[in-house]
Amino acid sequence: MDYEKIIHALIDDIVAEPESVLIRATESENGKDVVILVACEKDDTARLIGLHGIIANALREVISVAGRNENKHIHLKFESFGEENKED
């Protein structure tokens, strides 16, 4: 199953810059765990996590259901990139 495409379909309407979102899925050696890393701009990361993590938890639940069909445990992680030392 292409977890990267599923995540893109879910988040493209949420983020401001969908073309700058990087998604990488890495499967464990035992084949039962998959770690999906979503990296995007700081503001988009905040949108994906949502207030009190509501959106992130919903995304994790949806992707977990997809993983259950293949007996896989999915871990969804978020990271941001961009200008770290922004000067005013």
Per-region residue spans from a language model:
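The feature captures the beta-strand-to-loop junction immediately N-terminal to the Walker
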Residues: I49
